[in-house]
Curated annotation (Swiss-Prot):
This is Disheveled-associated activator of morphogenesis 2. The DAD domain regulates activation via by an autoinhibitory interaction with the GBD/FH3 domain. This autoinhibition is released upon competitive binding of an activated GTPase. The release of DAD allows the FH2 domain to then nucleate and elongate nonbranched actin filaments. Residues 523-532, 550-581 have a biased composition (Pro residues). Key regulator of the Wnt signaling pathway, which is required for various processes during development, such as dorsal patterning, determination of left/right symmetry or myelination in the central nervous system. Acts downstream of Wnt ligands and upstream of beta-catenin (CTNNB1). Required for canonical Wnt signaling pathway during patterning in the dorsal spinal cord by promoting the aggregation of Disheveled (Dvl) complexes, thereby clustering and formation of Wnt receptor signalosomes and potentiating Wnt activity. Residues 1025-1075 form the DAD domain. Residues 437-517 form a coiled coil. Residues 517-611, 1006-1025, 1048-1075 are annotated as: Disordered. It comes from the Eukaryota.
Length: 1075
């Protein structure tokens, strides 16, 4: 497609936005022009230009018109400005100065015309309303147009067009409504709004059906102008397709050609309509896609030629109208140029497009020796086979073929259609790509399928290798950690062993010396290490106190075997002296003989202030004095808190005188239907079917599964969940016996039977499978248990160490003793469960305030550090979720599993291994690492138990009666309530501050209004009327309040000068097509 350079002046008459000359500024008014005697002098040039610029901006003029306006002399500018302002301030025009009025009236007109027909007087009145709107859209400031758009005035006009009856459509009202849309489109913002509306152009095109000639002309001018707007050309073509359906046309543009050809009655001499139609046709042909696309112009022009436009053009020449003739000349001129350009492609001067034989010869000549020629023959051959009837029936197949060819010619490389008339959503480019080479595509498809399978297989292998690598890496890291810990432990124990050996050698030397009769002085031995050396050292120490000791054998050289135990002391030896440590004493000094008891020691009597009147009671659980010793309550002195607490305020606040069921979705068992073949099956049918389902998921042969189990799945073929499922299908003894009876028919066995038979041949298959599953599951189980143990340990430490918690309990104890009397009062401590009862005590003054809220207010005032208590107790939420019984049960299960693996490992070490069996080396490494990791978990659990027991004792709670989830849950719930109460107080403060701010603002506004009222009253009459109006007008103009209702009312009440203003109007009409 070769673009054709064209003289842009040839399209000049199509443009609806003016020519190249500067426009002439015309002033229109209903009254004749007269000179005005302005009382307000012309302002300085700078101020005048600023005001005039605001006025010109409101008019939304084109650049050329703006230049012409600014080129006016200052006196003319000031005259235009004052005239426009006078018009805006006219009291008679205020009601119609906003589009709301017009939109409401037109909506009511649309509703009323469906109820009854208008008489002539009503029609005239309605037409005047629409005409006034048209004038307002042309002459009112830009804000009027924007307000009209914001109020969806366009939809109001379009709805009127859609709903009007026949009489209205033939009346002047129809013409005026189209004129309103035309006026709106003369504004840049309005034009963009109309084009953006999805149905506007379609609805406008429906007005072509009227018999009103003026309406037809206005519609054609709009459609012709839209063709010249970016993205407008395609909308016009779509609108003509819409009109074809709306008007039941046989083909597109049929109505236009009929109107162009009509020469009877009032249409005989109606040159304006025919001129408008021809200008529209030229715009459709030469704008948009037709500007540079020869194929599009030929395509669309052929559509008009098929409708018979050429004889109509010849007939239109009889009118001898210069303007119409220019349109006709332009149509034929462009047609001749396009025909010549098409002929040049075939090296001809002219192509007779009416001759089928000539066109066929040209196509045949061009394609004769090309690869496309066979397809031309195929097309012709299939055309011969198309259905044929003498009466012209079955023409739709030919029509479809024609439209497909049209689409092929018109659609560009991007797949965009300049005209959707032939076939919508028909992408030629994609179809051509599909038909490039069917054999090649099939070959590529087969090759792609092969690549896809290879890719899937490689991805499967890669995933398997990645799993294997990840597992090996984890095992290596775990083994390195364990090895480092073992090295540290070995160095520590080697040092302890060396010290114990040195000590033992010293003792042996001393014994030898003693046996020779010397006196022995024993130095104080160092604290013995744990384990064997401790027992030996203790035994020797107690043996030294007896007589007639037999000589000890010489010390053995260091070896991995433990030394033999020392001989027991002879009977009859003296008993150990009083106060001597027991045999396995760890050197801990004996407990003090001073014991705490209520009889032995007395707690200092508390001097608690007494309230002036009864208070609400705090429902706590008081600890007995016997249980105070050794707890946190020993360190708390609530009497110190009374020194800083405001007890009087507290009395006012708390006076006694006031008031999953988890929905189990029904699970359906899945059964796979298997082919009924003659195969041997001795296993239970349902069990065999489930086994087949599992094997199909594994995607491994029996031999691959067997090798994976023998090699302990070093290549990670078996996932944890698959191993768990395999454990459900371990061959039972009854299954094995039955399968053994038919082992000679192994080839006929069903898949499940053969699998179970082959697995039963593996020695200790079940134990191997269980050991492998335990090995894979061990890191996960350890990772789940360890954080729970750590949570209990850390939470216990945090509770014991928290200083903020100690302070909080001190204040709560003080308030509780102040509130409670009798048996509930004078407490030295309370149970921790009482913390969650603090929020149950509500204030007598404000029911929204609880004792917990009050405590937080006290903390904010006197103990601000307590407010951050949660930072000291970060592990409480996790610890509150731990069930110690379940945790210990899980740890014991892990321990049992480890013992079972060790037992199986011992068995496998004793038997002769078959080739490829990797159980012993793999599980030996695993047991080494797992045993050490588990011992760490056990030690951590023991530490957590001890710390938890200390925490219970620290708070005076009974050991064994409260589980961690309950104990830590109490504190966790309290901290949550604490945080919620803090947020409540914050919200209350914000609400109170907002109310106070609002009250202050109202008071300030009231005071300001009163002040302004007094000032106005004081200054009344002091300023001249003219000066006040001038200042108010300038201020309102600059602030954009010039059209405010209050200001307008103010100006109407003032006396104005009797000057007549000049009115400017901005007639931005669509230029008629002319030269």
């Amino acid at each position: 497609m070769a673009p054709r350079k064209r003289n842009r002046h040839a399209l000049g008459f199509l443009c609806c936005f003016g020519g190249s000359d500067l426009p002439e500024i015309n002033l229109k008014d209903n009254n004749p022009l007269q000179f005005l005697d302005f009382t307000v002098p012309i302002p300085p040039t700078e101020e005048l230009n600023a005001r005039f610029s605001e006025l010109v901006d409101e008019l939304d003029l084109t650049d050329k018109n703006r230049e012409a306006m600014f080129a006016l002399p200052p006196e003319k500018k000031w005259q235009i400005y004052c005239s426009k302002k006078k018009e805006q301030e006219d009291p008679n025009k205020l009601a119609t100065s906003w589009p709301d009025y017009y939109i409401d009236r037109i909506n009511s007109m649309a509703a009323m015309q469906t109820l009854y027909a208008f008489d002539e007087e009503e029609t005239e009145m309605k037409n005047k309303i629409v005409e006034d709107l048209k004038t307002a859209l042309r002459t009112q400031p830009m804000r009027f147009v924007m307000r009209f758009i914001e109020l969806d005035g366009l939809s109001c006009l379009l709805n009127f067009l859609k709903s009007m009856d026949y009489e209205t459509s033939e009346s002047r009202i129809h013409t005026s409504v189209i004129g309103c849309i035309k006026a709106l489109m003369n504004n840049s913002q309005g034009r963009a709004h109309v084009l953006a509306h999805p149905e506007s152009i379609n609805i406008i095109s429906q007005s072509l059906r009227t018999e009103n000639i003026k309406t037809k002309i206005a519609v054609l001018e709009i459609l012709g102008a839209v063709c010249l707007v970016p993205d407008g050309h395609k909308k016009v073509l779509q609108a003509m397709l819409h009109y074809q359906v709306y008007a039941a046309e046989r083909t597109r543009f049929q109505t236009l050609l009929n109107e162009l050809d009509r020469s009877m009655g009032r249409y005989r001499d109606e040159v304006n309509l025919k001129t408008a139609i021809m200008s529209f046709i030229n715009a459709v042909l030469n704008a948009g896609a037709g500007e540079d696309n020869l194929e599009f112009r030929l395509h669309l022009r052929y559509e008009f030629l098929m409708l018979g436009i050429q004889p109509v053009i010849d007939k239109l020449r009889e009118h001898e109208n210069a303007t119409l003739d220019r349109h006709l000349d332009f149509f034929e001129m462009v047609r001749n140029e396009d025909d010549l350009e098409l002929a040049k492609r075939f090296d001809l001067i002219h192509i007779d497009t009416k001759s089928a034989s000539q066109m066929f010869e040209l196509i045949k000549k061009r394609l004769k020796h090309t690869d496309a020629y066979p397809y031309l023959l195929s097309i012709l051959q299939h055309c011969l086979q198309m259905p044929y009837k003498r009466n012209g029936g079955n023409f739709q197949q030919w029509q479809l073929l024609d439209r497909i060819l049209q689409q092929i010619v018109l659609q560009d490389e991007r797949g965009d259609d300049p005209d959707i008339a032939p076939l919508e959503n028909f992408n030629v480019k994609n179809i051509i790509k599909m038909l490039v080479n069917e054999n090649e595509v099939k070959q590529w498809r087969d090759q792609a399928e092969k690549f896809r399978k290879d890719h899937a297989e490689l991805m499967s292998k890669l995933e398997k290798k990645e799993r294997e690598c990840e597992t090996k890496t984890q095992e290596k890291d775990e083994m390195m950690k364990t090895l480092n810990k073992m090295k540290d432990k070995l160095q520590k124990e080697s040092l302890e062993l060396r010290q114990a050996r040195d000590q033992m050698n010293d003792l042996v030397a001393q014994l030898n010396e003693y046996s020779q009769g010397g006196s022995i002085s024993f130095p104080a031995p160092p604290p013995p290490p744990p384990g064997g050396p401790l027992a030996l050292s203790s035994a020797l120490s107690s043996a030294l106190t007896s007589e007639n000791l037999p000589p000890l054998p010489p010390p053995l050289p260091f070896s991995s075997c433990p030394p033999p135990p020392a001989p027991p002391p002879p009977p009859g030896g003296p008993p150990p002296p009083p106060g001597a440590p027991p045999f396995f004493s760890l050197g801990v000094p004996p407990p003090s003989t001073t014991t705490f008891s209520s009889a032995g020691t007395s707690l200092k009597k508390k001097s608690i202030p007494q309230p002036s009147h009864p208070l609400k009671s705090f429902n706590w659980a008081k600890l007995s004095e016997e249980r105070i010793h050794g707890t946190i309550w020993n360190e708390i002195d609530d009497l110190k808190a009374f020194k800083v607490l405001d007890l009087e305020d507290f009395e006012k606040m708390f006076s006694a005188y006031q008031r999953h069921q988890k929905e189990m979705g029904s699970t359906e068992d899945l059964y796979l239907s298997t082919r009924k073949v003659k195969e041997l099956s001795v296993i239970d049918g349902r069990r065999a079917q489930n086994c087949v389902i599992l094997l199909s998921k594994l995607k491994l042969s029996n031999e691959e599964i067997r090798q994976a189990i023998l090699k302990m799945d070093e290549q990670e073929d078996l996932a944890k969940d698959m191993l768990e499922q395999l454990l459900k299908f371990v061959p039972e003894k009854s299954d094995t016996d039955l399968l053994e009876e038919h082992k000679h028919e192994i080839e006929r066995m069903a898949r499940a039977d053969r699998f179970l038979f082959e697995m039963s041949r593996i020695d200790h298959y079940q134990q191997r499978l269980q050991a492998l599953f335990f090995k894979k599951k061990f890191p996960e189980r350890l990772a789940e248990a360890k954080p729970k143990v750590e949570a209990i340990l850390l939470a216990s430490k945090e509770l014991i160490r928290s200083k903020r918690l100690r302070q909080l309990l001190e204040v709560v104890l003080a308030f509780g003793n102040y509130m409670n009397k009798g048996q509930r009062g004078s407490a030295y401590g309370f149970k921790v469960s009482s913390l969650n009862k603090i929020a149950d005590t509500k204030s007598s003054i404000d029911r929204n305030i609880t004792l917990l809220h009050y405590l937080i207010m006290i903390f904010e005032k006197n103990y601000p550090d307590i407010l951050d208590i949660q930072t000291e107790l970060q592990h409480l939420p996790e610890a509150a979720k731990v069930n110690l019984v379940e945790l210990e049960k899980e740890v014991n299960n892990i321990k049992t599993g480890l013992k079972a693996v060790e037992a199986e490992l011992d068995y496998q070490k004793r038997r002769i291994r078959e080739s490829g069996d990797r159980f012993v080396p793999v599980m030996s490494d695993f047991i080494t690492v797992a045993s050490f990791s588990f011992s760490e978990l056990e030690d951590l659990l023991n530490d957590a138990r001890d710390k938890y027991a200390k925490a219970l004792k620290h708070f005076g709670e009974n050991e064994g009666k409260m589980q961690p989830d309950e104990f830590f849950g109490i504190f966790d719930t309290f901290l949550q309530s604490f945080a919620e109460a803090k947020q409540d107080l914050e919200n209350m403060r914000k609400k109170k501050e907002e109310e106070e701010r609002r009250a202050r603002m109202e008071a300030m506004l009231k005071e300001q209004r009163e002040k302004e009222r007094r000032q106005k009253k004081a200054k009344a009459g002091s300023i001249s009327e003219e000066t006040g109006e001038f200042d108010d007008l300038v201020s309102a103009l600059r602030s954009g309040e010039v059209f405010d209702k209050d200001l307008s009312k103010l100006k109407r009440n003032r006396k104005r000068s009797g000057n007549q203003g000049l009115e400017t109007s901005r007639e931005r009409v669509v230029t008629k097509l002319n030269y």
